Amino acid sequence: MGKDKLWRFSEIARFPNVTEAPFSETFPQKGKWKEEIFKNDKPIVLELGCGKGEYAVGLGKMFPDKNFLGIDIKGNRIYIGAKEALENNMDNVQFLRTRIDFIENFFEEGEIDEIWLTFSDPQPKKPRKRLTSPLFIGRYRKFLKKNGLVHVKTDSDVLFEYTEEQINNEGYKCHTLTWDLYGSFQNKLTKKEKEIFEIKTHYEELFASKGSVIKYCCFEI
């Protein structure tokens, strides 16, 4: 492991907006995120596989009336978003370092309002590990409030086609689905919605620079 990564790991251990917890144990603040961690009563939105936390931080700036929690196992990436949130005195943005496989250990029923899946690993050979698979949707249902939304933004045809199949097969209520987010679909968006999609992750910029078309959907589970 490089010295820079080690330094970032030591830094996030001191960051007040980063929580690290054992993977397989029930989190002591489960059900108490608003009260004990965010210290407010605002709705909580998750960014799963957040990487550098571009969406958690970006949405946090746009929606001060909501809490945003970026979740990833890569501490050196979380460092980027956590540092930016601290520098901007954002009390509505936090980060959790853990594996998404254990996500249900951290939240109580109905504790989360929305989920963003931004450029998740499409897992081409392991459909079960995709973050929109029945396995993971079942986990989200344990803590996502009734009528809570799942947002998916991706460059992957494989993941998006699979997600669309899950929506149709499972009968999820689909609010929005487009195979070309930045094409003519933009004409259907409000100014605020356009601003949301102007937030771009590191991977989106990378894939878009190579000509990938960005897809998006939003549905209830």
Model-derived regions: residue spans:
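A short SAM/SAH-binding and catalytic strip from SAM-dependent methyltransferases
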Residues: D113-L131
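Conserved beta-strand signature within the Rossmann-like core of class I S-adenosyl-L-methionine
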Residues: N147-T154
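Class I SAM-dependent methyltransferase "Motif I" SAM/SAH-binding loop
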Residues: G49-G51
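Conserved SAM/SAH-binding beta-strand->alpha-helix loop
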Residues: K74
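Class I S-adenosyl-L-methionine
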Residues: E165, E170-I221
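S-adenosyl-L-methionine
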Residues: M1-I44, E54-K61, A82-E109
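A short glycine-rich, Lys/Arg-flanked "PGG" loop and its adjoining helix->strand segment in the class I
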Residues: T132-K146
